[in-house]
Amino acid sequence: MKIAVTYDNGKIFQHFGKSQYMKIYETDENGEIQKVHIESMGKHSHHGIAGYIKEMGVETVICGGLGQGAVDSLEKAGITIYAGNSGNADMAVIKYLKGELIKNSDANCDHHHE
């Protein structure tokens, strides 16, 4: 399984669509982390990120806030969303793998895109 975390300097970046990096965790069938790397989102932003990480095989996203457009794109791509998180990215993934990370359905950000 692959898990993507919006990432900035060791922490969960708080705006999915503006995240410049995703930290990608690859686990084995026992839920043990096997590989970790940081992927630049480069030219991808907002709705484009969902398709890009889907192509990488990501199944779950851990992030801070995200807009409804990103939610729709991720859900359409079949990616599970764990929003409303903050703090250390590695610790969030460990909590997720232990079944301790809680989904927050109220973590959508309401803003206008230019």
Regions found by a protein language model. Give the residues of each.
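Short acidic active-site motifs
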Residues: 11, 48-49, 91-92
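C-terminal structural segments of small proteins and small subunits
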Residues: 68-112
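N-terminal first-folded block
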Residues: 2-41
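Compact, glycine-rich, soluble single-domain proteins
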Residues: 34-56
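Short secondary-structure boundary segments
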Residues: 7, 64-65, 85-86
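Histidine-centered active-site/metal-ligand motif
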Residues: 15, 44-46, 111-113
